[in-house]
């Protein structure tokens, strides 16, 4: 849930949005705001532990506010591999930022399995090495912290490109193979769901292809049944 409003009304709007969503579904929330103080203000209104989006090294206070907030809870957190200089163009800087954020988290008893690292994929229209850098960063991060999670804003890869959906689908498969185990994406998109399930089949993550077959029989993937 993200309010996306002006700072003056963000807390009020985000709380309203959280209430609306929690009245409709019994699912954990991913609370999203660029302002850690906003997250701090609405945190208590979540009915169950979810995910905080996000911390980074952009400013000194993000980790210092969010980590103590989720200390001793089951909350998880998304950590962006950027700092005050912006999004790194190289892999090593993303690795270095990851280490800093994981080490800070450890001081509050937050283990790597509660952290979702976002290596920040850049639009391929501006950097045609974007996927390769994302994959390399993902593999190295998983080598250092095997239990850590990897996520991404999936559609960022195709920004500025025509036929975006095929680029997004291809990115999903390659990123999953590299170690990405979650993504910010539309769960109602049939093509993306089919790609995700097919990739799980090919990676040996769907025993006897049961999830894929079940989704097809239910009409969730494949041609729409009349």
What are the language-model segments listed below?
Residues 12-116:
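Catalytic core of soluble alpha/beta enzymes
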Residues 1-27, 121-131:
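Glycine-rich, proline-tolerant flexible connector loops at the mouths of alpha/beta enzymes
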Residues 8, 59-61, 146:
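Short, charged helix-to-loop "capping" segments that act as catalytic/coupling loops
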Residues 223-226:
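Long amphipathic alpha-helical segments
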Residues 65, 72-221:
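Catalytic alpha/beta core domains of metabolic enzymes, predominantly
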């Amino acid at each position: 849930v993200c309010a996306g409003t002006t700072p003056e009304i963000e807390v009020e709007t985000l709380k309203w949005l959280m209430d609306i969503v929690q009245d409709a579904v019994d699912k954990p929330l991913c609370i999203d705001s660029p302002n850690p103080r906003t997250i701090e203000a609405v945190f208590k209104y979540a009915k169950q532990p979810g995910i905080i989006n996000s911390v980074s090294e952009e400013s000194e206070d993000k980790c210092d506010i969010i980590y103590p907030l989720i200390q001793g809870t089951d909350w998880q957190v998304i950590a962006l591999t950027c700092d005050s200089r912006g999004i790194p163009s190289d892999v090593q800087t993303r690795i270095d930022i990851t280490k800093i954020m994981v080490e800070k988290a450890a001081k509050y008893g937050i283990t790597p399995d509660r952290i979702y690292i976002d290596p920040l994929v850049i639009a391929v229209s501006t950097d045609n090495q974007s996927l390769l850098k994302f994959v390399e960063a993902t593999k190295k991060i998983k080598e250092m912290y095997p239990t850590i999670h990897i996520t991404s804003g999936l559609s960022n890869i195709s920004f500025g490109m025509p036929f975006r959906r095929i680029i997004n689908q291809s990115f999903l498969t390659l990123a999953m193979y590299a170690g990405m185990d979650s993504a910010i994406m539309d769960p109602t998109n049939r093509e993306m769901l089919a790609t995700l399930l097919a990739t799980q089949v090919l990676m040996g993550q769907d025993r006897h292809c049961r999830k894929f077959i079940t989704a097809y029989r239910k009409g969730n993937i494949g041609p729409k049944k009349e």
